[in-house]
Amino acid sequence: MMRADGRSSCELRPVHIHPHYMKHAEGSVLIEVGDTKVICTATVEEKVPSFMRGGGKGWITAEYGMLPRATEQRNVREASKGKVSGRTMEIQRLIGRALRSVVDLEQLGERTIWIDCDVIQADGGTRTASITGAYVALVLALAKLVEEGRLEALPIRDFLAATSVGIDPEHGVILDLDYNEDARAKVDMNVVMTGAGQFVEIQGTGEEAVFSRAELDELLEAAQIGIEQLIAVQRRALGEWAARIGEKKEAAEEDTE
């Protein structure tokens, strides 16, 4: 049975990543996953938080936000409330944690990469789209440092992407839930994986329901299918830099000789 938007159970929504979307940021993209659209930027700061000074390692941190009319009903800006919501804080930490998992922070050196993810239109999967887009923005920012001679090689070990999976009352296990599917799902799960197929994070909950080990395995298999396709889109967006993911510093030095 086809889903409401005509997709099969294990089919992603159309995904587009537009690189160099913002003029001033060292790295930036607009990522579109169906009707969900997120602007992701990466900013390089030549210092680290005070607790890391002198340690010889860099840091990656993230901020996440949503425009008031990214949703069907207007949301009040968090700046107007004077505090960041628990949901926003959780997503920010997830994005930063995910990106740090594939970066050699020692090779990055004592600098901070600020990731900003701003949702301009939301239709489910904003946190997973943010991770997938932020990864490309991060690579573009680090590529600029390599081009400028401030880094000898990309300090990135592997690709990284994220997607959602769930169990729908009618369709069973489905990939890449939109807002309406997420609202009715019996089980909702966000999965972050590397290009090598290793898991970075799995966030899964039953909504007034339980799920079996067999269903968990099926959910993770569907997520892996989707993430492999997302990484293919990332590769196209990165162009020649995609081939340099995971390169060693020594190899990069030989290429420049």
From Swiss-Prot:
Specify which residues bind phosphate according to the UniProt entry for this protein: 87, 125-127
What this chain does, per the entry, is described as: Phosphorolytic 3'-5' exoribonuclease that plays an important role in tRNA 3'-end maturation. Removes nucleotide residues following the 3'-CCA terminus of tRNAs; can also add nucleotides to the ends of RNA molecules by using nucleoside diphosphates as substrates, but this may not be physiologically important. Probably plays a role in initiation of 16S rRNA degradation (leading to ribosome degradation) during starvation.
One Pfam family assigned to this protein is RNase_PH_C
Signal peptide start-end:
none
Q: What is this protein called?
A: Ribonuclease PH
Query: A GO molecular function for this record?
Result: tRNA nucleotidyltransferase activity
**Stretches that traverse the bilayer:** none
What gene, per UniProt, encodes this protein? rph
Keywords of the record: Nucleotidyltransferase, RNA-binding, rRNA processing, Transferase, tRNA processing, tRNA-binding
Provide the species name.
Geobacillus kaustophilus (strain HTA426)
EC number from the UniProt entry: 2.7.7.56
| Gene3D superfamilies the UniProt entry points to | GHMP Kinase, N-terminal domain
Q: Which family does it belong to?
A: Belongs to the RNase PH family.
Kindly give the HAMAP family that the UniProt entry links to this protein.
RNase_PH (MF_00564)
Q: Which InterPro entries match?
A: ExoRNase_PH_dom1, ExoRNase_PH_dom2, ExoRNase_PH_dom2_sf, PNPase/RNase_PH_dom_sf, Ribosomal_Su5_D2-typ_SF, RNase_PH, RNase_PH_bac-type, RNase_PH_CS
NCBIfam families attached to this UniProt entry: RNasePH
Biological process (GO), any one = rRNA catabolic process
Q: Which SUPFAM superfamilies match?
A: Ribonuclease PH domain 2-like, Ribosomal protein S5 domain 2-like
Catalytic reactions on record: tRNA(n+1) + phosphate = tRNA(n) + a ribonucleoside 5'-diphosphate
On subunit structure and binding partners, the annotation says: Homohexameric ring arranged as a trimer of dimers.
